[in-house]
Amino acid sequence: VTGKYTNLAKLLLDKLKISQYFDYVIGSDLCEHPKPHPCSLKKALDKLNVDSKDSIYLGDHINDIKAALACNAYACAVRWGYGEGDCGKIETWKANAILDKPQDLIPLIRKLELKT
């Protein structure tokens, strides 16, 4: 789920050679309401047949976190990306977790698996 248009997001994933890791891409053009409205997240979860409580949503912008929380997903703020400078301190976003680098995701997933 991205704020970019779907076709642009797909082009970026192709250019980065990571598109094979994504089952579904939904951009802002496929939903009536932009984030922080949870429409795009709910649409992706429905398409993937995943309950929001079983999902982790990573976001670099406060609107990502608000959207994740609005649909009951685990909201994980990330320090890489664009949002922190525009949205104030990441610690004020009310995310369930904050990741400093992509490598921190695996330990978080393992920790969350232990709780279930």
Regions found by a protein language model. Give the residues of each.
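Conserved Lys-Pro-Asp/Glu-containing loop-to-beta segment of HAD-superfamily phosphomonoesterases
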Residues: 34-65
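Short amphipathic alpha-helix with an adjacent loop that forms part of the alpha/beta core around
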Residues: 105-115
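Short secondary-structure boundary segments
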Residues: 3, 29, 61, 79-82, ...
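Phosphate- and divalent-cation-binding pockets in alpha/beta enzyme and binding domains
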Residues: 8-11, 43, 67, 107-108
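Acidic, Mg2+-coordinating phosphoryl-transfer loop and its flanking beta/alpha structural elements
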Residues: 57-96
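Conserved H-loop
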Residues: 19-23, 51
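Substrate-recognition element of Asp-dependent hydrolases with the DxDx(T/V) motif
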Residues: 1-13
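Short acidic-hydrophobic, aromatic-tinged amphipathic segments that line or gate anion-handling sites
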Residues: 97-101
